[in-house]
């Protein structure tokens, strides 16, 4: 969330890394490495910050967030962004600490905190080594384009993928991840404004209100 277990089990619009998924991967024994001329999976950055737009079929909505990703220490922080006034919409901060097996959900306005066990083990945001190379192409137009590579969990020429990952050919930055179930896109995440490193490691430290955290996940609407 590849056989790695389901990679990112997404249970809510902000949980790309459980949130998964933080993540929904089902890579079931992918094919052997390609021929000598076939590109090999690159190594995605271990620590970066950026933004994401997440579309989830279950809600039919896009959600935006700031992301701090620390693969070295197996932790992720996601901060909801407000791009429009949505009545009865609560914004949260999510701190996922996989080494501790716990996620903190903090309401931005009140600092109310929920502490929730993480059921899935850490699974990095990267290209699994047994992925299938699909294509390489440029995004944008003349003078303003970037080369990317597309990978999937497709096993043979006749099978269908359940995961598609797009990463830059240079530096291996994540661009987009898409998860498919029963021929339908269930989750799609676009990454942008990616910068290497973590400016402030304290973003992974829960606020003091989490010392008395509630054990249940808070809802995204106005009701508790």
From Swiss-Prot:
Key words, A-Z: Disulfide bond, Glycoprotein, Lipid-binding, Lysosome, Secreted, Signal
One GO BP annotation of this record: myofibroblast contraction
Main location: other
Entry superkingdom: Eukaryota
Coiled-coil region(s): none
Protein's UniProt keywords contain Glycoprotein: yes
Tissue expression profile of the protein: Detected in brain (at protein level).
Signal peptide stretch: 1-37
Cellular component terms (Gene Ontology): extracellular region; lysosomal lumen; lysosome
Residues listed as glycosylation sites in the UniProt record: 130, 182
Places the protein is found: Lysosome lumen; Secreted
Disulfide linkage: 42-172, 88-222, 113-210
Processing and modification events after translation: N-glycosylated; the glycan contains mannose-6-phosphate moieties.
GO molecular function: calcium ion binding; ganglioside GM1 binding; identical protein binding; phospholipid binding
Record's subunit section: Homodimer.
Similarity section: Belongs to the ependymin family.
Function: Binds anionic lipids and gangliosides at acidic pH.
Protein name: Mammalian ependymin-related protein 1
Organism: Rattus norvegicus
């Amino acid at each position: 969330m590849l056989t790695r277990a389901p990679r990112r089990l997404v249970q809510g619009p902000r949980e790309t890394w459980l949130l998964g998924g933080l993540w929904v991967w089902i890579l079931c024994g992918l094919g052997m490495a390609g021929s000598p001329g076939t590109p090999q999976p690159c190594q995605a950055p271990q620590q970066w910050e950026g933004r994401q737009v997440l579309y989830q079929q279950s809600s039919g909505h896009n959600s935006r967030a700031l992301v701090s990703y620390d693969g070295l220490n197996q932790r992720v922080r996601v901060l909801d962004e407000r791009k429009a006034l949505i009545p009865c919409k609560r914004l949260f901060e999510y701190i996922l600490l996989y080494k501790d097996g716990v996620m903190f959900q903090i309401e931005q306005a009140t600092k109310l905190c929920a502490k929730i066990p993480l059921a899935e083990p850490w699974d990095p945001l990267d290209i699994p080594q047994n992925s299938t190379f699909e294509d390489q192409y440029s995004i944008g137009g003349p003078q303003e384009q970037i080369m990317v590579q597309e990978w999937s969990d497709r096993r043979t020429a006749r099978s269908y993928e359940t995961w598609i990952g797009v990463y830059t050919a240079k530096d291996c930055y994540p661009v987009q991840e898409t998860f498919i179930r029963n021929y339908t896109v269930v989750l799609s995440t676009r990454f942008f404004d990616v910068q290497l490193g973590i400016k402030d490691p304290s973003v992974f430290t829960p606020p003091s209100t989490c010392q008395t955290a509630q054990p249940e996940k808070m809802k995204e609407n106005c009701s508790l």
